[in-house]
UniProtKB/Swiss-Prot annotation:
Record flagged with keyword Manganese: no
One GO-annotated biological process of the protein: oligopeptide export from mitochondrion
PANTHER family: ATP-BINDING CASSETTE SUB-FAMILY B MEMBER 10, MITOCHONDRIAL (PTHR43394:SF1), ATP-DEPENDENT PERMEASE MDL1, MITOCHONDRIAL (PTHR43394)
TM region(s), chain numbering: 93-113, 147-167, 219-239, 242-262, 325-345, 358-378, 762-782, 810-830, 884-904, 910-930, 995-1015, 1025-1045
SUPFAM superfamilies per record: ABC transporter transmembrane region, P-loop containing nucleoside triphosphate hydrolases
SMART domains named in the record: AAA
Residue ranges, compositional bias (Basic and acidic residues): 1-20, 31-41
Family the entry assigns: Belongs to the ABC transporter superfamily. ABCB family. Multidrug resistance exporter (TC 3.A.1.201) subfamily.
Family annotation (InterPro entries): AAA+_ATPase, ABC1_TM_dom, ABC1_TM_sf, ABC_transporter-like_ATP-bd, ABC_transporter-like_CS, P-loop_NTPase, Type_1_exporter
Main location class: membrane
Protein species of origin: Trichophyton equinum (strain ATCC MYA-4606 / CBS 127.97)
Catalysed conversion reaction: itraconazole(in) + ATP + H2O = itraconazole(out) + ADP + phosphate + H(+)
Identification of the protein by name: ABC multidrug transporter MDR2
Keywords: ATP-binding, Cell membrane, Glycoprotein, Membrane, Nucleotide-binding, Repeat, Transmembrane, Transmembrane helix, Transport
Length: 1331
């Protein structure tokens, strides 16, 4: 029999756990994945191209191939820049047109200044040759200086409108893209998610949408302004003298060739970088979401290395991209300076030939200077546009995908009066992601209306597939599912799902209140629109029916209690009961219970099962169960084996047949020794217990002040709780978050990331300084050139000679700039990508270093931390690499330019320099505002990204509740709030940006007016004047450019502070600390001495109250009791996930809080309820149990044999090399659990901790695995937490917990004879043939 995975939909983790996923050919699938990832195909499906899909599905008949193809195929969208604006509204486009015109008009201001400059040059020559009087000269000078002031005012207004406008439109359009993307994600069929990592969705919705926003916001305005400057400058040049302008225009062709050639590589590299980061994001999401597992096994180092594999790939492509941009910028500068040389050389010839005058040449040359210089401002933005296009292609490929099974579609019929008869007719099913495995073959089954049908069978037999097909998560490849005789494919999908309520094994709650979580069950029902009062009554009634009301009322905020992300503040049993209340609140026609009580303890299960039995009366119910005691009373029990129906009938009929069902029953039977006590008495006792729990007031059940036995249950689950040794945590948290760092501290901190590159970085700084000195040198050449062209006709011979010399100097300067700019680009590419690589790697390691308390904080949800890794590290590059090089370069320009100006004309230079502090102040003030804005804005995007991540990772729950619309409304609300906040902030900061950019005109007005006066009086000659003015123009422009980087610098400062905070956080339980005694050998005595413990999230409610417990070496003890009584907390404290409030936990008489935590944990092994596997092979996952990368095969085989998984692994084509998929999605729950057990056994631990280790297994697997665990426990101290009491009968001592204390202990037989709590629990779980 082919063993296939059991549970496709039990865990809403975004990478759906496919019950079909026998890893039989996972290696082929993975090689396909790798192939396509390397090609850089679209985001989610690793095999979305038609060729790849056809190859994978080639072995299937054509009609089956088509059905699977529809569920997997993703269109390959060829995005262009225009595609990014596809969601712009008419108003957006009108606004865009206005702000574009403003940007273009702002760009024309500088070329207009060249006209004034040329005119003044002619005037200066006239006064020098005494052609005009001093008064006439003064009048012309004053008038032209005022024109400069008017130009400055116009520039200020236009730049302000442009900057605010583009940021607003960019944010508005990106907001729509974010919403459309999430909307598209929520419409996809589940097969799409089987190929998608949850981390990828987070990366797309945060990092990639941010890239789009960056590419369509203020950078568009800056680019349009630069291009406008370029073109208007050349137009002015052509108008003044077309021949010279035409010759200078030849450089445009050279620039286009350089930009065009290099940008192809830039786009490709950008795309490949994003692909690698997406894959890394998936790994990070896997690890962070299962942090307790990683902590218990000490696998942080191995998992960090796995993450780094993807980071290295991203670094490689990122370096290529940055290097190409550096070379492109160097080439542009070389072309620009060569153009000056060409212009002077040809201009001198035309002047000597009498074809033009000095005024026109100066005008044209200056226009070419400014026009060519402005094109340099376009180059840095090309990366942002290229990244935006790459990100857009990925996002739009998902948005454009037409889902094969679309819950958002209005197509399909509805049935007026649903009766609830379900029929599976000739069903054959293959999961799209595992086309090699047939999960169901020839299934014919009728589920009569109003009756309860139970599905049982071994793990992976196809039971949960029935739920998947009825909910239409998948389409079968042949056959049909009928509801009241209608094929469900013809029915409207949303309507269909609204007729069905699903409770799955691992329920998903949403990060809102208990009341709102239950209310979600009313979506689409007639009761949805009732009054608030009626809805409240329904919700309370449903909670009572699900045995949840009492524990809810015991919580401080009752129904208004926030359950935390995915319900993490509640225990498994509590979450399950809320999920049941949610399912029954709408009084559905069809109820699907996919192991609905498996997470409950026996006490809760008895009552909830009674509630479910009552709830299922009169409605069609399909129950999937491993625990057979829950389905004895079903109208029909269907036994499914290997994807086919083996037998069906009632409990009694099947027991009489003595077939597969009886084997399952025998495997689960508890051998009670009850003497002569009759069965009737036993049943009577059970009924009494149930009625007692339902009717006795909550306080008396709990003997005193703590209402309901589950008051602390919300605090009792190891995999969900906040932790730290005392309530001081809340104060410590506020201190952490309030820590402020100075700019110097942050710069030193970021520089630390580039320590290994410090030598080549110094070279980079050297080249940046040389590049920066280029412009002041060019100012000297320019002033010399103009002076040369001012010579009278009598000296035209000298004029030609000097012009040739200075033209050659320009050519030399161009070559030097080519070398220095390119070298700087290459060096900073290496440095900045290394910085991003180390920042991601170290911050991931810093996260993994943290104790469990850190991950329990609401702001540290999986989505938020994954988003932090993808977004914030990118922002750090705002003070590294290319940006830092450019800042150093333009700072050098400013300093050298002003120094040269002072050296040649100190009076004029001092007047001009007096304006520079104002320029700097404008820029730095804007930088400060943006840093503040960034801190606020980031929080909002983090919460919306975290929300989107939560919704997509719970996609099956969202789909079955038809909650898509509600998710979208909340998400859009969060985006709208963010947009309003950011607009106010941008409106302020843009004032300063516009001021800093337009202030140069006021400087020029002052410089011309004052310098002209000096020249008119004969104090300065033309060379001094032109040199000072030229230096000031470029100097002040450089200052403006520094501050155009301040958005990046603002983001970087905010990001650096977050990183510093993370790195500075030293956890109380620190895995990196060498402190504490190291244990060489362990005997295995565990003691709890008067342990008190409570979680800081609910500091007012104790979890453990004076726990005293001793486990002797080699002893097997079991902890049982109601949900939330502190059993799993005990395991958590043994693992030292948390420290106790008072009292202590001791091993061999030593307080574990004084031991070295790594050394101590190396002697423990944990097998928890939800097994966690990571991407990689089966062998990799088993080896995570030890800290070595390689072990002899014999040891690996022995561990797997002991866990009863060896034979299954060897039956796979690739054996131990089989890839398990994201979160082990290629395997069934049972298979994953056995690999997790092998991982625990390979450690050869002295202490074995089993937290409901067999609860995910069916009876058949459980029996064998339990035998393996029993064998493994020999010679080891073993602590087992169990709901299923059959698994712990053989324990040396069984401790019964209640309210954080031990109320009873002894062996199985002793406790049965006592007829106390344990006896009640056993009684309720006993499975006997009904008489």
């Amino acid at each position: 029999m082919v063993e296939v995975s059991e549970k496709p939909n039990t865990q809403d983790d975004g990478v759906s756990k496919q019950e079909n996923r026998n890893p039989a050919s996972s290696s082929s699938s993975t090689s396909d994945k790798e192939k396509v990832a390397k090609k850089g195909n679209s985001d989610a499906t690793k095999s979305s191209t038609p060729e790849d899909l056809d190859a994978q599905l080639a072995h299937l008949p054509e009609h089956e191939r088509e059905i699977l193809k529809q569920q997997l195929f993703i269109p390959d969208v060829k995005a262009t820049y225009g595609t990014l604006f596809r969601y712009a509204t008419r108003n957006d486009m009108i606004f865009l047109a206005i702000v574009s015109l403003a940007s273009i008009a702002a760009g024309a201001a500088l070329p207009l200044f060249t006209v004034l400059f040329g005119s003044l040059a002619g005037t200066f020559r006239d006064i020098a040759l005494h052609r005009i009087t001093y008064d006439e000269f003064n009048s012309i000078l004053t008038r032209n200086s005022l024109y400069f002031v008017y130009l400055g005012i116009a520039q200020f207004i236009l730049l302000y409108v442009s900057t605010v406008g583009f940021i607003y439109v960019g944010e508005h359009i990106t907001q729509k893209i974010r919403a459309k993307y999430l909307h598209a994600i929520l419409r996809q069929n589940i097969g799409f998610f089987d190929k998608l990592g949850a981390g990828e969705v987070t990366t797309r919705i945060t990092a990639d949408t941010n890239l789009i926003q960056d590419g369509i916001s203020e950078k568009v305005g800056l680019t349009l302004t630069a291009l406008s400057t370029f073109f208007s400058a050349f137009i002015i040049g052509y108008v003044r003298y077309w021949k010279l302008a035409l010759i200078c225009s030849s450089t445009i062709v050279a620039m286009i060739l350089v930009m065009g050639g290099i940008s192809r590589f830039v786009v490709k590299s950008g795309r490949m970088t994003l692909v690698s980061y997406g894959e890394g994001g998936t790994v990070a999401e896997e690890v962070i979401s299962s942090i307790r597992n990683a902590t218990a096994f000490g696998t942080q180092e191995k998992l960090a290395r796995q993450y780094e594999v993807h980071l290295k790939e991203a670094r490689k492509w990122g370096r290529r991209l940055q290097m190409m941009l550096g070379i492109m910028f160097g080439s542009m500068m070389a072309i620009m300076y060569s153009n000056y040389g060409l212009g002077f050389w040809m201009g001198s010839r035309f002047l000597v030939g009498g074809e033009t005058d000095l005024s026109a040449i100066v005008n044209i040359l200056l226009a070419i200077v400014i026009g060519s210089f402005s094109i340099g401002n376009v180059a840095p933005n090309t990366q942002a546009f290229a990244s935006a296009i790459s990100a857009g292609a990925k996002i739009f490929s998902t948005i454009d995908r037409v889902s094969a099974i679309d819950p958002g579609s209005d197509e399909g019929d509805t049935i007026e009066n649903v009766e609830g008869t379900i029929e599976f007719r000739g069903i054959k099913h293959i999961y799209p992601s595992r086309p090699e495995v047939v999960v169901m073959e020839d299934i014919n089954l009728v589920v009569p209306k109003g009756k309860t049908t139970a599905l049982v069978g071994p793990s992976g037999s196809g039971k949960s597939t029935v739920v998947g097909l009825l909910e239409r998560f998948y389409n079968p490849v042949s056959g049909s599912v009928l509801l009241d005789g209608r094929d469900i494919k013809t029915l409207n999908l949303r309507w269909l799902r609204q007729q069905i309520s699903l409770v799955s094994q691992e329920p998903t709650l949403f990060g809102t209140t208990i009341f709102e979580n239950i209310r979600l069950g009313l979506i689409g029902s007639p009761m949805e629109n009732e009054s608030e009062e009626q809805i409240k009554e329904r919700i309370v009634s449903a909670a009572k029916e699900a045995n949840a009301h009492d524990f809810i009322m015991g919580l401080p905020d009752g129904y208004a209690t926030d359950v935390g992300q995915r319900g993490f503040l509640l225990s498994g049993g509590q979450k399950q009961r809320i999920a049941i209340a949610r399912a029954i609140v709408s009084d559905p026609k069809i109820l699907l219970l996919d192991e609905a009580t498996s997470a409950l303890d026996t006490k809760s299960e008895g009552v909830v099962q009674a509630a479910l039995d009552a709830a299922s009366r009169g409605r069609t119910t399909i129950v999937i169960a491993h625990r057979l005691s829950t389905i004895k009373s079903a109208d029909n029990i269907v036994v499914i084996v290997g994807g086919r129906i083996a037998e069906q009938g009632t409990h009694d009929e099947l027991v009489d047949k003595k077939g597969t069902y009886l084997q399952l029953v025998e495997a689960q039977k508890i051998n009670e020794e009850r003497g002569e006590e009759s069965e009737d008495e036993a049943v009577l006792e059970k009924e009494k217990e149930i009625s007692r729990q339902i009717s006795v007031p909550a306080k008396s059940v709990n003997s005193g002040k703590y209402p309901d036995e589950d008051v602390e249950a919300n605090l009792g689950r190891i995999d969900t709780k906040k932790s730290l040794s005392s309530v001081i945590l809340s104060q410590k948290r506020s201190q952490e978050n309030e820590t402020e760092y100075s700019l110097g501290t942050l710069i030193r901190f970021i520089a630390g990331f580039n320590k290994p590159e410090r030598l080549i970085m110094l070279c980079g700084f050297f080249f940046a300084v040389l590049s920066g000195a280029g412009q002041p040198v060019q100012s000297v050449f320019f002033a010399k050139g103009i002076t040369t062209l001012s010579l009278p006709p009598s000296l035209y011979g000298k004029l030609r000679e000097d012009a040739n010399f200075w033209s050659l100097m320009f050519l030399m300067l161009g070559l030097v700039q080519l070398v220095t700019q390119s070298a700087q680009g290459v060096i900073f590419a290496i440095c900045s990508e290394s910085l991003i690589y180390r920042a991601r790697s170290k911050s991931f390691r810093a996260m993994l270093r943290q104790d469990i308390a850190f991950f329990d904080l609401p702001e540290n949800s999986t989505g938020a931390l994954t988003s932090f890794l993808s977004t914030e590290t990118k922002h750090l590059s705002g003070v590294s690499g290319a940006t830092l090089g450019t800042i150093l370069m333009v700072s050098t320009t400013l300093i050298v330019a002003l120094t040269v100006a002072l050296a040649f004309g100190w009076k004029l230079a001092l007047v001009c320099i007096s304006t520079v502090p104002v320029l700097l102040l404008c820029g730095f003030y804007r930088f400060w505002i943006l840093a503040q804005f960034q801190t606020r804005a980031k929080k909002a995007y983090e919460s919306s990204a975290s929300y989107a991540c939560e919704a997509t990772s719970s996609i099956r729950t969202v789909a079955s509740l038809t909650r898509e619309q509600g998710v979208m409304e909340i998400y859009e609300g969060q985006l709208n709030d963010q947009a309003k906040k950011s607009l106010r902030s941008v409106a302020k900061s843009s004032l300063l940006y516009a001021a800093s950019q337009s202030f140069s005109f006021f400087c020029l007005a002052l410089g011309f007016w004052y310098g002209g006066g000096l020249l008119g009086k004969g104090e300065y000659n033309a060379f001094q004047f032109f040199l000072c003015i030229s230096c000031v123009i470029f100097g002040s422009q450089s200052a403006g450019i520094v501050f155009s980087f301040s958005p990046d610098m603002g983001k970087a400062k905010s990001a650096a502070a977050d990183f510093k905070r993370l790195f500075d956080r030293v956890p109380t339980i620190d895995i990196e600390s060498p402190d504490g005694e190291k244990l060489e050998t362990v005997e295995g005595t565990i003691e709890f001495r008067d342990v008190h413990f409570r979680y800081p999230t609910r500091p007012e409610q104790p979890v453990l109250r004076g726990l005293n417990l001793t486990v002797k070496p080699g002893q097997y003890i079991a902890l049982v009791g109601p949900s939330g009584c502190g059993k799993s907390t005990t395991i958590a404290l043994v693992e030292r996930f948390y420290d106790t409030l008072s009292g202590g936990v001791y091993i061999d008489g030593k307080d574990i809080s004084r031991l070295n935590v790594n050394s101590y944990r190396s002697h423990l092994a944990l097998v928890s309820q939800e097994p966690t596997l990571y991407q990689g092979t089966i062998r990799d996952n088993v080896l995570l149990g030890v800290d070595r990368d390689e072990l002899p095969d014999e040891q690996v085989f022995a561990a797997c044999k002991a866990a009863n998984i060896y034979d299954f692994i060897m039956s796979l084509p690739d054996g131990f090399g089989t890839v398990v998929g994201s979160k082990g999605s290629m395997l069934s729950g049972g298979q994953k659990q056995r690999i997790a057990i092998a991982r625990a056994l390979i450690r050869d631990p002295k202490v074995l901790l089993l937290d409901e280790a067999t609860s995910a297994l069916d009876s058949e697997s459980e029996k064998v695995v339990q035998a393996a665990l029993d064998a493994a426990a020999k010679g080891r101290t073993t602590i087992a937490v169990a709901h299923r009491l059959s698994t712990i009968q053989k324990a040396d001592i069984i401790y019964v917990f209640d309210q954080g204390r031990i109320v009873e202990s002894g062996t199985h037989h002793e406790l049965l004879q006592n007829k106390g709590r344990y006896y009640e629990l056993v009684h309720m779980q006993s499975l006997e043939k009904t008489q």
